[in-house]
Amino acid sequence: MLIGYVRVSTNEQNTALQRNALESAGCELIFEDKASGKKAERPGLKKVLRMLSRGDTLVVWKLDRLGRSMRHLVVLVEELRDRGINFRSLTDSIDTSTPMGRFFFHVMGALAEMERELIVERTRAGLDAARAEGRIGGRRPKYQEETWQQMRRLLEKGIPRKQVAIIYDVAVSTLYKKFPASSFQS
């Protein structure tokens, strides 16, 4: 059975073009979502994935209508293949029921994996470069060491943590973490 899936990014957009193409391709059922492809929550896609069974073919008008990213798309099509379900994209001329279509998807999978590895590599290189320049990542500390020492001196003088917290606009729990209760009598 050919089962279609259409998606538009907003409620203002029309699914008619996609629906017509899927109907012309012979889709018996068509599911739809009106949401950004970046959103993981797509009820129409969830329904179609539950509905598909061995021997069915999921048909989309264009690849970007199905996947949020190339990696997501490859993973999704692999899951379909594992369940005995084919995938077809009309405008991209992809059909995983054919040897050429399966080959194309293997190539896409390899490219997606390479892309992921390159991102990891660039991220590591960027972090290493930042460390070499003395940056350690994360946000800047709210207080310099001198300010912490001032708080410590007040606590040592017996000023209650709550009062120090108000003076320095810091949570009492932060003071307990930085200066454990066993350190002071307050």
UniProtKB/Swiss-Prot annotation:
Active site per database record: S9
CDD domains, A to Z: SR_ResInv
Q: Name one GO molecular function term.
A: DNA binding
Task: Tell me which Gene3D superfamilies the record gives.
Answer: Homeodomain-like (1.10.10.60), Resolvase, N-terminal catalytic domain (3.40.50.1390)
| Domain called Resolvase/invertase-type recombinase catalytic: residue spans | 1-134
Sorted alphabetically, which keywords does the UniProt record give? Answer: DNA integration, DNA invertase, DNA recombination, DNA-binding, Viral receptor tropism switching, Virus entry into host cell
A GO BP entry is: viral tropism switching
User: Which InterPro entries does the record cross-reference, listed alphabetically?
Assistant: Homeodomain-like_sf, Recombinase_CS, Resolv_N, Resolvase-like_N_sf, Resolvase_HTH_dom, SSR_resolvase
Which residues form the DNA-binding region?
161-180
Question: Function of this protein?
Answer: Performs inversion of a viral 3 kp segment (C-segment) that encodes two alternate pairs of tail fiber proteins thereby modifying the host specificity of the virus.
Regarding protein family, the annotation reads: Belongs to the site-specific recombinase resolvase family.
Report the protein name in the record: DNA-invertase
Organism encoding this protein: Escherichia phage P1
